[in-house]
Design a protein with these regions (language model features):
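N-terminal pro-sequences and low-complexity stem/linker regions of secreted or lumenal proteins
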Residues: 1-173
Length: 173
């Protein structure tokens, strides 16, 4: 289930490659441990070991050719390093953080647990020395859910499409 590592890796250009080529620092923060890694649309599945170097549903980057070829695997770090970097003012120019299952807001996880986790991530930056020059782009990977309980209005045969929430948080927003 999950990412099939027996097939060829991803050979297309990704954002990390473009950042690397432009000499823009980046990091991808994740939680280690055992996480559900469901194939397709399965609701339940066995947990798989997740780590910085192991591709999986929460960490696709080790499967990208450019991440390996450009020696960027070290940019994939555990989330505890995010909190340390935020406190010390040493976050890279671009950071991504992916949750683990208990804080992902995916069923059966509690939404309040996910919201508390996101709040801790944001507060870490706000309380750090880089807050004055930081913008946080918060988005979710799914549409629907509890935040959007009404179908978008029908304007034509195509429609607006499904809505995915996004927030920009900064001293200037």
């Amino acid at each position: 289930s999950g990412l099939d590592t027996s097939k060829n890796d991803y050979a297309w250009t990704d954002l990390t490659y473009l950042l690397h080529k432009a000499n823009v620092s980046w990091a991808y923060y994740l939680s280690e441990g055992n996480q559900p890694d469901c194939a397709d649309d399965a609701m339940l599945c066995q947990a798989k070991s997740q780590s910085q170097k192991v591709p999986g549903i929460w960490n696709p980057l080790p499967a990208f050719d450019t991440v390996k070829q450009d020696n960027q695997l070290a940019n994939i770090q555990t989330v505890d390093k995010y909190f340390t970097a935020a406190k010390n003012g040493t976050l890279p120019a671009v950071s991504w953080i992916t949750p683990d299952n208990p804080v992902s807001e995916h069923p059966p996880a509690k939404i309040s647990t996910g919201q508390a986790y996101v709040t801790s991530l944001i507060n870490a930056v706000m309380q750090g020395p880089d807050w004055d020059s930081t913008a946080i782009f918060l988005s979710w990977d799914d549409w629907g859910g509890f935040y959007d309980h009404v179908v978008p209005p029908k304007v034509d045969e195509i429609g607006y499409g499904l809505r995915v929430p996004g927030l920009v948080i900064s001293p200037y927003a």
